[in-house]
Swiss-Prot record:
Topological type in the membrane: Peripheral membrane protein
Family, per entry: Belongs to the SecA family.
UniProt-listed GO biological process terms: intracellular protein transmembrane transport; protein import; protein targeting; protein transport by the Sec complex
Residue positions binding ATP: 86, 104-108, 493
A GO cellular component annotation in the UniProt record: cytosol
GO molecular function: ATP binding; protein-exporting ATPase activity
Name recorded for this polypeptide: Protein translocase subunit SecA 2
Enzyme Commission designation: 7.4.2.8
UniProt xrefs under HAMAP family: SecA
Catalysis: reaction(s): ATP + H2O + cellular proteinSide 1 = ADP + phosphate + cellular proteinSide 2
Gene it is expressed from: secA2
Length: 788
């Protein structure tokens, strides 16, 4: 088996595979010796390994014996023995890379190996899954092995309280969903004291379904938001107005990037309807914001595709998994625009208080690895963004699934009729059938076509998510037909029922090419697990969403030269190349978008690191607040001098009265020197005139050093001012990011433009924080009444 895989790999990966095979042989050589040990002797190996690491040995020095110990423990506790290929997968993960392993190859058991080894270092290991159910399942299953070997295992899920979270993070190995680890990071950086923080420094993480977490979820940042009021009436009015707008006449919409903007006619129509002169005037900023969000809600979001309406609420749907994203809402008024569009009650608007992208969160881990059945197609991105390689792992048994050639029809109607015929054919044979769809809407469309032929099926989408485990459990039974969104693409295996193996196994039908080959491959991979028989076939049409979004003009040209049969099946072979090429364009577009967004987010990530580092310093009880404030005084004076001593103006034109007033706000001094064009001709002159005054003032501030109550008060005030300024900063950055794409007409790279303006905004934010702290100290000292 290993030899058959080698020829599929490049030279460097062949060499690595050979190295792994040698290590596997060394692990196997220890099996008999370890099997003779008692449970207590085997458990004592953990203490031995920890001592070796403490004495200077490395993870590489102990990995062979440690892997052999985990394998022996799994045999005793679970009755499961790691296959050689699973040991190879574990070695790949230990090196911080991605193990590509098809469905059913036992990825969960593979993770037990590197998690044990890295947990021996005593710094914590995080095992990331895509949902709570899998986190609990894996913790309960693999946790038994690690606990048998003397390690502590924790579970981090949204439902537990902070004290339980703290215990979960203190464990040697912590299971949970990736978003919750990210939200805990944000919450820790909003904490009012060190005691409220739950995480410890990051060390090593293994991400199950790593492509789903790091690529599919990469477009959605993690956001903790507070509430701010919004105008329900204006939202409803804008939603009503936008329904009368016509595409291309009043607005343009780019389906590829899902961006929308008003045309000149659209702007004029808004100005006429609201009886205003210029929509872009500052006084109409709120109206413009509500209108653009109403437009986005109207054209970029589709009910039963991007969201569902349930119990009079908008519930967002993850287009990659097909699942409802519990507790998630759109920010900046877009969620309220969707509510207005659907005629629902308007909820309070969210204001971002803390945020981070999935990419920048996981890049904080010194060592990161992952497993998935489908990663090779995205290897370039994994390498560029995360410095990880993808290593295809040999299967324990050969894959014998038959992946049939796609069939392409002219119309969607012809396609769905062909799907129905294929279902009838395989159903007559008694084979179970899984029909994969792109959205809730499409799953219900397929269901209607099957209803017309009185075909019995079960439907799995975000509306029936609570029945997911039961539906998947029966999806491999004889004669069973399951229509599912991408929810069925990951997680629980579809096991074949009695007699199904002999009939040919599970038959998978794809009803549309996804915007990534990975997702197509995941769907195919539901059949043919662990050497089972199975088959897959995709039914496509020229009306499919991907072709409409990325190749509408090409479709129109192509249609003229196609040959079809009486069912609408396209017989011209070049259509397959066209579909494949469009999918590659689509993947490239998404990659470029993620890369562009990451470049922008790297800017705010650097700013976030500065703020959070300062914030954590403020939380330390032994931090001397006076030592922090003294430099702020100099910074604030310098900022005020720049504000009023404007370069390019004559000193006689400078506003010395306002300059003096601003200095009095931040300096509690009895006699402020007289400032005028007579003694100040430059910022340097101001520093010279104020030198003695500043020195005396800072001496007064330094005298507060021993006042412990004031130190504590300053700590709380600093945290309050910093958090307040950071929230406002995030708001400003959101608006900057929204507007930067519209300014590409300028002869400047939008990324560089964003970096420049983001720096200006950050310097303003930080300067404002320092001024507020200086004002607070000045008020505490008491500004004398006889200030001149």
């Amino acid at each position: 088996m290993l030899n058959s895989v080698k020829k599929l790999l490049g030279d460097s990966q062949k060499r690595k595979l050979k190295k792994y095979e040698q290590l596997v042989q060394e692990i196997n050589n220890l099996e008999e010796k370890l099997s003779d040990l008692s449970d207590e002797e085997l458990r004592h190996k953990t203490i031995t390994f920890k001592d070796m690491l403490r004495d200077g040995k490395t993870v590489d020095d102990i990995k062979v014996e440690a892997f052999a110990v985990v394998r022996e423990a799994a045999k005793r506790v679970l009755g499961l023995r790691h296959y050689d290929v699973q040991l190879i997968g574990g070695l790949v993960l230990l090196e911080g890379n991605i193990a590509e392993m098809p469905t059913g190859e036992g990825k969960t058991l593979v993770s037990s190996l590197p998690t044990y080894v890295r947990a021996l270092e005593g710094k914590g290991v995080h095992v990331i899954t895509v949902n709570d159910y899998l986190a609990k399942r894996d913790k309960e299953l693999i946790g038994q092995v690690h606990e048998f070997l003397g390690l502590k295992v924790g579970l981090n899920i949204p439902q537990i309280d902070p004290s339980e979270k703290k215990l979960a993070y203190e464990a040697d190995i912590t299971y949970g969903i990736g978003t919750e680890f990210g939200f805990d990071y944000l919450r820790d950086n909003m904490a009012a004291s060190k005691n409220e923080q739950v995480q410890r420094p990051y060390h090593f993480a293994i991400i199950d379904e790593i492509d789903s977490v790091l690529i599919d979820e990469a477009k959605t940042p993690l956001i903790i938001a507070g509430k701010k009021s919004s105008s329900s009436d204006l939202h409803y009015l804008c939603a009503k107005v936008i329904k009368s707008f016509q595409d291309t006449l009043h607005y343009t919409y780019d389906a590829e990037s899902k961006s929308a903007s008003f045309t000149e006619d659209g702007i004029t129509k808004i100005e006429d309807l609201f009886d205003i002169d210029n929509l872009y005037d500052l006084e109409h900023q709120t109206l413009y914001h509500y209108m653009i969000q109403a437009l986005r809600a109207h054209v970029a979001f589709q009910c039963d595709v991007d969201y569902i309406v349930h119990d009079e609420k908008i519930l967002l749907v993850d287009i990659f998994t097909g699942r409802v994203m519990d507790g998630r809402s759109l920010s900046d008024g877009l969620h309220q625009a969707l509510e207005a569009k659907e005629g629902l009650e308007i909820t309070e608007e969210n204001q971002t208080q803390a945020s981070i992208t999935i990419q920048n969160f996981f890049r904080m881990y010194p060592a990161l690895s992952g497993m998935t059945g489908t990663a090779k197609t995205e290897e370039k991105e994994f390498n560029r963004v995360y410095n990880m390689e993808v290593m295809p792992i040999p299967t324990n048994r050969p894959i014998i699934r038959e992946d049939k050639k796609d069939v392409v029809y002219v119309t969607a109607d012809a396609k769905y009729k062909a799907v129905r015929e294929d279902v009838l054919k395989h159903n007559k044979q008694g084979r179970p059938i899984l029909i994969g769809t792109m959205s809730i809407l499409q799953s219900e469309t397929v269901a209607r076509y099957l209803d017309e032929a009185n075909i019995t099926y079960q439907l799995l989408n975000a509306k029936s998510a609570e029945q997911e485990a039961d539906l998947i459990a029966t999806a491999g039974q004889k004669g069973q037909i399951t229509i599912a969104t991408n929810m069925a693409g990951r997680g629980t295996d579809i096991l074949l029922g009695e007699g199904v193996h002999e009939l040919g196994g599970l038959h998978v039908i794809g009803t549309e090419r996804h915007e990534s080959r990975r997702v197509d491959n995941q769907l195919k991979g539901r059949a043919g697990r662990q050497g089972d028989p199975g088959s897959s076939q995709f039914f496509l049409s020229l009306e499919d969403e991907m072709l409409k979004r990325f190749a509408q003009e090409e479709v129109e040209k192509l249609t003229k030269s196609l040959k079809t049969d009486e069912t609408g099946l396209i017989l011209t072979s070049k259509v397959h190349d066209f579909v494949n090429r469009t999918q590659l364009i689509c993947e490239g577009s998404h990659f470029s978008m993620r890369e562009y967004n990451l470049k922008l987010d790297d800017v705010i990530n650097d700013q976030r690191n500065v703020i959070y580092k300062l914030r954590n310093n403020l939380l330390q009880e032994d931090t001397n607040m006076i030592e922090i404030i003294i430099p702020m005084i100099d910074h604030a004076v310098e900022a005020i001098s720049k504000q009023y001593l404007v370069e390019g103006m004559l000193p006689e034109e400078w506003d010395f009265a306002s300059l003096t007033a601003s200095l009095n706000e931040i300096l509690s001094v009895e006699n402020m020197p007289s400032l005028s064009a007579n003694n100040v001709h430059s910022p340097e002159d101001l520093q010279s005139v104020l030198k003695e005054t500043l020195s005396l003032y800072k001496e007064r501030v330094n005298e507060l050093d021993s006042n412990t109550d004031l130190q504590q008060s300053l700590r709380y005030v600093a945290l309050h001012f910093l958090d307040q300024n950071w929230v406002n900063h995030l708001d400003a950055m959101t608006h900057l990011k929204e507007g930067i794409g519209l300014r590409q007409y300028q002869q400047e790279d939008p990324t560089r433009l964003y970096q420049k303006e983001a720096l200006d905004i950050f310097l303003y934010t930080y300067g404002n924080f320092e001024k507020e702290m200086c004002r607070y100290v000045a008020r505490h000292l008491g500004v004398p009444e006889n200030v001149q």
